[in-house]
Protein backbone atom coordinates (compact mmCIF):
# COMPACT_ATOMS: atom_id res chain seq x y z
CA UNK A 1 0.00 0.00 0.00
CA UNK A 2 2.83 2.35 0.90
CA UNK A 3 4.61 1.61 -2.37
CA UNK A 4 1.41 2.34 -4.31
CA UNK A 5 1.01 5.71 -2.56
CA UNK A 6 4.65 6.54 -3.27
CA UNK A 7 4.21 5.70 -6.95
CA UNK A 8 1.10 7.89 -7.12
CA UNK A 9 2.99 10.74 -5.45
CA UNK A 10 5.83 10.40 -7.99
CA UNK A 11 3.39 10.49 -10.89
CA UNK A 12 1.54 13.50 -9.50
CA UNK A 13 4.83 15.32 -8.95
CA UNK A 14 5.92 14.50 -12.49
CA UNK A 15 2.62 15.73 -13.93
CA UNK A 16 2.79 18.96 -11.92
CA UNK A 17 6.31 19.63 -13.22
CA UNK A 18 5.22 18.86 -16.80
CA UNK A 19 2.19 21.18 -16.50
CA UNK A 20 4.38 23.94 -15.06
CA UNK A 21 6.91 23.64 -17.89
CA UNK A 22 4.15 23.78 -20.51
CA UNK A 23 2.28 26.68 -18.92
CA UNK A 24 5.29 28.79 -17.99
CA UNK A 25 5.84 30.24 -21.52
CA UNK A 26 2.18 31.32 -21.59
CA UNK A 27 2.42 32.87 -18.11
CA UNK A 28 5.66 34.62 -19.10
CA UNK A 29 4.09 35.96 -22.30
CA UNK A 30 1.02 37.30 -20.48
CA UNK A 31 3.13 38.73 -17.65
CA UNK A 32 5.52 40.51 -20.02
CA UNK A 33 2.61 42.01 -21.95
CA UNK A 34 1.47 43.72 -18.72
CA UNK A 35 4.87 45.28 -17.95
CA UNK A 36 6.45 48.50 -19.08
CA UNK A 37 9.88 48.44 -20.73
CA UNK A 38 11.74 49.09 -17.47
CA UNK A 39 10.03 46.17 -15.74
CA UNK A 40 10.86 43.84 -18.64
CA UNK A 41 14.60 44.31 -18.19
CA UNK A 42 14.63 44.07 -14.41
CA UNK A 43 17.09 41.52 -13.04
CA UNK A 44 14.45 39.88 -10.84
CA UNK A 45 12.04 37.45 -12.45
CA UNK A 46 8.59 38.67 -11.46
CA UNK A 47 5.67 36.80 -13.06
CA UNK A 48 3.13 39.15 -11.43
CA UNK A 49 3.92 42.72 -12.49
CA UNK A 50 2.81 45.48 -10.15
CA UNK A 51 1.31 47.74 -11.11
CA UNK A 52 0.17 46.03 -14.33
CA UNK A 53 -0.22 48.24 -17.38
CA UNK A 54 -2.50 47.81 -20.38
CA UNK A 55 -0.70 50.50 -22.34
CA UNK A 56 0.95 47.86 -24.53
CA UNK A 57 -2.45 46.60 -25.70
CA UNK A 58 -3.60 50.16 -26.36
CA UNK A 59 -0.47 50.77 -28.45
CA UNK A 60 -1.03 47.58 -30.44
CA UNK A 61 -4.69 48.31 -31.15
CA UNK A 62 -3.97 51.90 -32.25
CA UNK A 63 -0.69 51.51 -34.16
CA UNK A 64 -0.85 47.95 -35.49
CA UNK A 65 -3.35 46.87 -38.21
CA UNK A 66 -4.35 43.93 -36.05
CA UNK A 67 -7.87 43.53 -37.43
CA UNK A 68 -6.51 43.14 -40.97
CA UNK A 69 -4.14 40.37 -39.90
CA UNK A 70 -6.84 38.70 -37.81
CA UNK A 71 -9.17 38.67 -40.83
CA UNK A 72 -6.44 37.26 -43.12
CA UNK A 73 -5.66 34.49 -40.64
CA UNK A 74 -9.31 33.76 -39.86
CA UNK A 75 -10.28 33.59 -43.54
CA UNK A 76 -7.51 31.12 -44.37
CA UNK A 77 -8.16 29.04 -41.24
CA UNK A 78 -11.92 28.80 -41.83
CA UNK A 79 -11.60 27.75 -45.49
CA UNK A 80 -8.89 25.18 -44.74
CA UNK A 81 -10.81 23.83 -41.74
CA UNK A 82 -14.08 23.48 -43.65
CA UNK A 83 -12.36 21.74 -46.57
CA UNK A 84 -10.39 19.34 -44.37
CA UNK A 85 -13.42 18.45 -42.24
CA UNK A 86 -15.66 17.86 -45.28
CA UNK A 87 -13.12 15.76 -47.19
CA UNK A 88 -12.25 13.78 -44.06
CA UNK A 89 -15.89 12.81 -43.47
CA UNK A 90 -16.62 11.99 -47.12
CA UNK A 91 -13.42 9.99 -47.65
CA UNK A 92 -13.88 8.10 -44.38
CA UNK A 93 -17.46 7.24 -45.37
CA UNK A 94 -16.19 5.84 -48.68
CA UNK A 95 -13.46 3.79 -47.00
CA UNK A 96 -15.81 2.30 -44.39
CA UNK A 97 -19.08 1.69 -46.26
CA UNK A 98 -18.06 1.11 -49.88
CA UNK A 99 -16.22 -1.82 -51.35
CA UNK A 100 -14.12 -0.86 -54.34
CA UNK A 101 -11.04 -2.25 -56.00
CA UNK A 102 -7.74 -1.49 -54.25
CA UNK A 103 -9.55 0.12 -51.31
CA UNK A 104 -7.01 -1.09 -48.75
CA UNK A 105 -4.12 -0.20 -51.05
CA UNK A 106 -5.40 3.35 -51.43
CA UNK A 107 -5.92 3.68 -47.67
CA UNK A 108 -2.47 2.30 -46.86
CA UNK A 109 -0.97 4.64 -49.45
CA UNK A 110 -2.65 7.54 -47.69
CA UNK A 111 -1.18 6.38 -44.37
CA UNK A 112 2.28 6.36 -45.93
CA UNK A 113 2.00 10.10 -46.49
CA UNK A 114 2.28 10.54 -42.71
CA UNK A 115 5.91 9.45 -42.95
CA UNK A 116 6.91 11.93 -45.67
CA UNK A 117 8.80 14.88 -44.11
CA UNK A 118 6.94 18.12 -44.73
CA UNK A 119 10.17 19.73 -45.94
CA UNK A 120 10.25 17.32 -48.90
CA UNK A 121 6.94 18.72 -50.17
CA UNK A 122 7.77 22.41 -49.79
CA UNK A 123 9.58 22.90 -53.10
CA UNK A 124 7.08 20.97 -55.28
CA UNK A 125 4.17 22.82 -53.66
CA UNK A 126 5.91 26.17 -54.07
CA UNK A 127 6.62 25.54 -57.76
CA UNK A 128 3.01 24.45 -58.28
CA UNK A 129 1.68 27.63 -56.62
CA UNK A 130 4.07 29.68 -58.77
CA UNK A 131 2.86 28.08 -62.01
CA UNK A 132 -0.77 28.60 -60.96
CA UNK A 133 -0.09 32.28 -60.25
CA UNK A 134 -1.10 31.94 -56.60
CA UNK A 135 2.02 33.38 -54.96
CA UNK A 136 1.29 36.21 -52.53
CA UNK A 137 -2.39 35.25 -52.33
CA UNK A 138 -4.35 33.52 -49.56
CA UNK A 139 -5.30 30.80 -52.05
CA UNK A 140 -1.66 29.83 -52.39
CA UNK A 141 -1.56 29.28 -48.64
CA UNK A 142 -4.81 27.29 -48.62
CA UNK A 143 -4.53 24.99 -51.63
CA UNK A 144 -1.85 22.50 -50.45
CA UNK A 145 -3.68 21.99 -47.15
CA UNK A 146 -7.28 21.39 -48.22
CA UNK A 147 -7.14 17.64 -47.48
CA UNK A 148 -5.75 15.98 -44.37
CA UNK A 149 -4.81 12.30 -44.12
CA UNK A 150 -4.92 12.25 -40.32
CA UNK A 151 -8.46 13.62 -40.38
CA UNK A 152 -9.53 10.87 -42.78
CA UNK A 153 -7.92 8.25 -40.53
CA UNK A 154 -9.61 9.55 -37.37
CA UNK A 155 -13.02 9.79 -39.04
CA UNK A 156 -12.63 6.28 -40.45
CA UNK A 157 -11.88 4.90 -37.01
CA UNK A 158 -14.85 6.76 -35.53
CA UNK A 159 -17.26 5.51 -38.21
CA UNK A 160 -16.10 1.94 -37.75
CA UNK A 161 -17.43 2.15 -34.20
CA UNK A 162 -21.01 2.74 -35.40
CA UNK A 163 -23.13 -0.45 -35.11
CA UNK A 164 -23.73 -2.00 -38.53
CA UNK A 165 -27.37 -3.01 -37.74
CA UNK A 166 -28.24 0.67 -37.35
CA UNK A 167 -27.04 1.42 -40.87
CA UNK A 168 -28.59 -1.72 -42.32
CA UNK A 169 -31.95 -0.71 -40.84
CA UNK A 170 -31.70 2.69 -42.51
CA UNK A 171 -30.87 1.07 -45.86
CA UNK A 172 -33.81 -1.34 -45.52
CA UNK A 173 -36.06 1.66 -44.93
CA UNK A 174 -35.00 2.96 -48.34
CA UNK A 175 -32.37 5.51 -47.30
CA UNK A 176 -29.91 6.51 -50.02
CA UNK A 177 -26.15 6.62 -49.26
CA UNK A 178 -26.16 10.40 -48.78
CA UNK A 179 -29.17 10.09 -46.46
CA UNK A 180 -27.37 7.43 -44.41
CA UNK A 181 -24.37 9.74 -44.10
CA UNK A 182 -26.16 12.97 -43.21
CA UNK A 183 -29.18 11.66 -41.28
CA UNK A 184 -27.75 8.61 -39.49
CA UNK A 185 -23.97 8.88 -39.27
CA UNK A 186 -23.43 12.63 -38.91
CA UNK A 187 -25.58 13.03 -35.76
CA UNK A 188 -23.49 10.28 -34.14
CA UNK A 189 -20.08 11.67 -35.08
CA UNK A 190 -20.72 15.41 -34.60
CA UNK A 191 -18.46 15.61 -31.51
CA UNK A 192 -15.61 13.98 -33.43
CA UNK A 193 -16.09 16.26 -36.43
CA UNK A 194 -16.07 19.26 -34.10
CA UNK A 195 -12.89 17.99 -32.42
CA UNK A 196 -10.89 17.54 -35.61
CA UNK A 197 -12.23 20.85 -36.93
CA UNK A 198 -10.85 22.61 -33.86
CA UNK A 199 -7.47 20.92 -34.38
CA UNK A 200 -7.48 21.90 -38.05
CA UNK A 201 -8.35 25.49 -37.17
CA UNK A 202 -5.63 25.80 -34.52
CA UNK A 203 -3.03 24.28 -36.83
CA UNK A 204 -3.96 26.64 -39.66
CA UNK A 205 -4.12 29.66 -37.33
CA UNK A 206 -0.60 28.97 -36.05
CA UNK A 207 0.93 28.10 -39.45
CA UNK A 208 4.11 30.05 -40.00
CA UNK A 209 6.58 28.54 -42.44
CA UNK A 210 4.35 27.96 -45.49
CA UNK A 211 2.70 31.42 -45.39
CA UNK A 212 6.20 32.87 -44.96
CA UNK A 213 7.17 31.39 -48.35
CA UNK A 214 3.97 32.37 -50.14
CA UNK A 215 3.00 35.80 -48.78
CA UNK A 216 5.00 38.97 -49.46
CA UNK A 217 2.61 41.93 -49.38
CA UNK A 218 2.15 43.27 -45.85
CA UNK A 219 -1.59 43.56 -46.42
CA UNK A 220 -1.82 39.78 -46.97
CA UNK A 221 0.18 38.63 -43.94
CA UNK A 222 -1.21 36.28 -41.31
CA UNK A 223 -0.84 36.93 -37.58
CA UNK A 224 2.30 34.81 -36.99
CA UNK A 225 4.06 36.60 -39.87
CA UNK A 226 2.83 39.99 -38.69
CA UNK A 227 4.19 39.27 -35.21
CA UNK A 228 7.60 38.41 -36.62
CA UNK A 229 7.52 41.53 -38.82
CA UNK A 230 6.68 43.66 -35.80
CA UNK A 231 9.54 42.25 -33.73
CA UNK A 232 11.99 42.77 -36.60
CA UNK A 233 10.77 46.33 -37.22
CA UNK A 234 11.27 47.24 -33.56
CA UNK A 235 14.76 45.78 -33.53
CA UNK A 236 13.81 43.25 -30.86
CA UNK A 237 13.61 45.96 -28.17
CA UNK A 238 9.86 46.42 -27.59
CA UNK A 239 9.34 43.03 -25.98
CA UNK A 240 6.38 44.10 -23.87
CA UNK A 241 4.46 45.27 -26.95
CA UNK A 242 5.54 42.17 -28.88
CA UNK A 243 4.18 39.98 -26.07
CA UNK A 244 0.90 41.91 -26.19
CA UNK A 245 0.64 41.06 -29.90
CA UNK A 246 1.55 37.44 -29.14
CA UNK A 247 -1.11 37.25 -26.42
CA UNK A 248 -3.83 38.58 -28.73
CA UNK A 249 -2.65 36.16 -31.43
CA UNK A 250 -2.81 33.19 -29.06
CA UNK A 251 -6.23 33.90 -27.57
CA UNK A 252 -8.51 32.33 -30.25
CA UNK A 253 -6.83 28.88 -30.35
CA UNK A 254 -6.45 28.80 -26.55
CA UNK A 255 -10.12 29.65 -26.00
CA UNK A 256 -11.26 27.15 -28.63
CA UNK A 257 -9.20 24.35 -27.15
CA UNK A 258 -10.31 25.22 -23.63
CA UNK A 259 -13.98 24.86 -24.53
CA UNK A 260 -13.59 21.81 -26.78
CA UNK A 261 -10.82 19.75 -25.15
CA UNK A 262 -13.34 17.11 -24.00
CA UNK A 263 -14.41 16.41 -27.60
CA UNK A 264 -10.79 16.33 -28.79
CA UNK A 265 -9.71 13.83 -26.13
CA UNK A 266 -12.73 11.59 -26.77
CA UNK A 267 -12.01 11.58 -30.51
CA UNK A 268 -8.47 10.31 -30.04
CA UNK A 269 -9.69 7.71 -27.52
CA UNK A 270 -12.32 6.47 -29.98
CA UNK A 271 -9.77 6.25 -32.78
CA UNK A 272 -8.11 3.38 -30.92
CA UNK A 273 -11.29 1.36 -30.36
CA UNK A 274 -11.45 -0.12 -33.86
CA UNK A 275 -8.35 -1.30 -35.68
PLM feature spans:
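A structural signal for multi-pass alpha-helical bundles of membrane permease subunits
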Residues: 2-275
Amino acid sequence: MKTKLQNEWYWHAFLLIAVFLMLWPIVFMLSTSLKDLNQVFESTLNPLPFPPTFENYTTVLHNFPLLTYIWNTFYIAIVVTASKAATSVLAAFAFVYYNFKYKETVFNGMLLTFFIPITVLIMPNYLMMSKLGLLDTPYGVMLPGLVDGMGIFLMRQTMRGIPKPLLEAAILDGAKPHQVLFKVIMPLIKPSVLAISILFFINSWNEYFWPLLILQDKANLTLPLALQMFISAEGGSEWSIAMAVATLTSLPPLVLYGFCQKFIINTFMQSGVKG
